[in-house]
């Protein structure tokens, strides 16, 4: 039974991607989740309970963060088991982190076959972007959702969670009625740059996919 006032609707969300892509920074932005996180020693994981208030009541994502184990190779199956959704993160200033996305995706779907997955390109606040919108095609091949994000500026923080919530609840009209308390931005996302990136993504979306897999 959920405790009094606890959201009845809860989902296990696994957060994966190369070390240094900003996964922990991202999940720590949600202040109550950071305050109430629990450490699971057997798996070496921190679980952050992130609550979002929607027009259909509160939803909790129990976000599993690896605490850096991915630097030592793959993650154990216990991390993925019973995950109901996932975020795969890479760093837009580091091409190798995007090149490794297919490996993370493969590990994930081997254990969790048909779960909704969002791909996030983090650090878009940094001017020296290496992985441009037109080269981000993996999500289109695998039917994932994609968002540019900037954890340190809170840019698009809620987008992956809203998309996952709509998929998991089965309601495309689900909305967040209030934003969670987020840590104050450490950097400011340039609105002109954000607008440019949104346009680039729209243009890329309208372009035919390349046949070869050289871009992965």
From Swiss-Prot:
Disruption phenotype: Morpholino knockdown results in defects in eye development and reduction of cell density at the neurula stage. Co-knockdown of nemp1a/b and ran elicits reduction of cell density and eye defects more significantly than the individual knockdown of either one. SMART domains: RAB, RAN, RAS, RHO. Residues 68-84 are annotated as: Switch-II. The record marks 69 as: Essential for GTP hydrolysis. GTP binds at residues 18-25, 36-42, 68, 122-125, 150-152. GO terms for biological process: eye development; GTP metabolic process; mitotic sister chromatid segregation; protein import into nucleus; ribosomal large subunit export from nucleus; ribosomal small subunit export from nucleus; ribosomal subunit export from nucleus; snRNA import into nucleus. Monomer. Interacts with rangap1, which promotes ran-mediated GTP hydrolysis. Interacts with kpnb1. Interaction with kpnb1 inhibits rangap1-mediated stimulation of GTPase activity. Interacts with rcc1 which promotes the exchange of ran-bound GDP by GTP. Interaction with kpnb1 inhibits rcc1-mediated exchange of ran-bound GDP by GTP. Interacts (GTP-bound form) with tnpo1; the interaction is direct. Interacts (GTP-bound form) with tnpo3; the interaction is direct. Interacts with kpnb1 and with tnpo1; both inhibit ran GTPase activity. PANTHER family: GTP-BINDING NUCLEAR PROTEIN RAN, RAN GTPASE. This is GTP-binding nuclear protein Ran. It comes from Xenopus laevis. The lineage of its organism: Eukaryota, Metazoa, Chordata, Craniata, Vertebrata.
């Amino acid at each position: 039974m959920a405790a009094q006032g606890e959201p009845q609707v809860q989902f296990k969300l696994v957060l994966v991607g190369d070390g240094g892509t900003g996964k922990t920074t991202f999940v720590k932005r949600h202040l109550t989740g950071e305050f109430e996180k629990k450490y699971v020693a057997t798996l070496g994981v921190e679980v952050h309970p992130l609550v979002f208030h929607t027009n259909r009541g509160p939803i909790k994502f129990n976000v599993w963060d690896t605490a850096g184990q991915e630097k030592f190779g793959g993650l154990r199956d216990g991390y993925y088991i019973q995950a109901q959704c996932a975020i795969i993160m890479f760093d837009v200033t580091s091409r190798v982190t995007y090149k490794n996305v297919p490996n993370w995706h493969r590990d994930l779907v081997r254990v969790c076959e048909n779960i909704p997955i969002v791909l996030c390109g983090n650090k878009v606040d940094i001017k020296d972007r290496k992985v441009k919108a037109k080269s981000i095609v993996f999500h289109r091949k695998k039917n994932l959702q994609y968002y540019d994000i900037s954890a340190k500026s809170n840019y698009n923080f809620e987008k992956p969670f809203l998309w996952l919530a709509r998929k998991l609840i089965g309601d495309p009209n689900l909305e967040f009625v209030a934003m969670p308390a987020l840590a104050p931005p450490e950097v400011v996302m340039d609105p002109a740059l954000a607008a440019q990136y949104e346009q680039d993504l729209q243009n890329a979306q309208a372009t035919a996919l390349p046949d070869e897999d050289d871009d992965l």
